[in-house]
Amino acid sequence: MLALAASSALAQTRVVSQPAADSAASAAPSQSPAATAPAAAAAPVSLSARKVYEQARPSLVQIRTVLKGGPSQTSVGSGFLVTAQGHIVTNFHVVSEAALKPERHDLVYVTADGREAPLVILQLDVLHDLALLRAGDALAPLAASAAGAGASAAGATTSVKATSVKATSSKVGANAAAASSAAPRGFEPLAFRPASQPLAQGERIYSLGNPLDVGFTITQGTYNGLVRRSFYPQIFFGGALSAGMSGGPALDDEGHVVGINVARRVDGEQVSFLVPAEFAIGLLARGKDAAPIIGPAYGIVDEQLQQHQAALTDRFIAQGWKEATHPRYRVPVPPDVFMRCWGTSEVSRTGGLDFERSECQMDTRIFVGEYTTGTISLRHESYDGSKLGPLRFAARYSQSFRNESFIRLPAQHQTKPRCNEDFVDRDGLPLRAVVCMRAYKKLPQLYDVSVLVATLDQPESGVQGRFDAQGVSFGNAQKLAQHYLDAFRWVR
């Protein structure tokens, strides 16, 4: 999955470890055209799409992260106005550089008709990748433009009320006449689709934003329900999204906001994702009267990640393990509630080592500036070395164990791993186990934990397993490691 903010060079892509049959890029603030497949060409814009775009155009903004003291931008994304007081919704990953390094970056918005002014950050929802901003220059002008500019523009019929957005806000279509580039209008806030009107499978929706910094656009697609196995709800949007559209609105036929652009798959066509509008509504309610965030927002990020890791640990442990599939051992494999598992096998044709591999990962990862966290993955490999003999098998088996690395992030983000190795007994099954932990330097209460396990009872066969949890507390790291180790047993 690739987040859709675009960097100035469009040249950075971060790819996570992937199942062989279902690879995906992780959330990242930028996209490399050379490294990822281009989005599928959008279908011709319908008359309905034109109507929706013309109604929404005065509410759209491009959000630029710029270096302090200079005009150079480091990333761009999209956003949209949600109140006449100048509140703007976008993605956290769009503004993360300014949120985490405010001493180096500023935020500005650019409207569809070219106006540019500064922004301030009021509230963050890191877990759902949302941010609430406010136009730092324009509280009075925004209210005035929403109340008066629309009525004075050519073709305008009514003004938009300057009220806070709620789930039951009146629809946009009746209150916003079509705008045109020849007669630009003032900002007009978008309304959210009422919660009493849930989307139906196959319903047409429209995504708006500024892809690749080339200009505002609209893409048409369909609502395909919520994404399966996502830890937090996300909408599966059957339409094309491109880098730079992150944070833009997704609208229904009436111009109501139903979601916020957030990511797309790079290994498929028109497989895109939206944050459901309900989370933006909640963010607005919590943050519309908040003072601007001053200084790096790591404290806010840390607090929200603490909530996430607690919920993740509880849910992961509560779900238990699948029934054993290995003929000799009970090997920990999670159910596919919020993880997906893939398997491969390789039979040596030269009398070497045969093995089977299973790998399970969460699709959900929490974006934190230059890296992601808040996820769990695990795998196991079953080895058959009967063609090698005990000595050669022992050498290959031990080498595979030693090949594992426990360094994930650069030194500026995380400490070196500290590991303990021991030989343990699980219900009579001898195991070699290594537990490693790494601390986050700017998120001081969070750790990554890795557990590496190898069975030792057979001279020509065995199972090796690895468990990784990112962004958990020290106590939960210990709890998860023990939960994983306890799952290795004999099959009886």
Model-derived features: where do they sit?
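Bacterial N-terminal signal peptides
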Residues: M1-S8
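Secretory pathway targeting signatures of secreted, lumenal, and periplasmic proteins
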Residues: M339-A394
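Signature of long, low-cysteine stretches enriched in small and polar/charged residues
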Residues: A395-L456
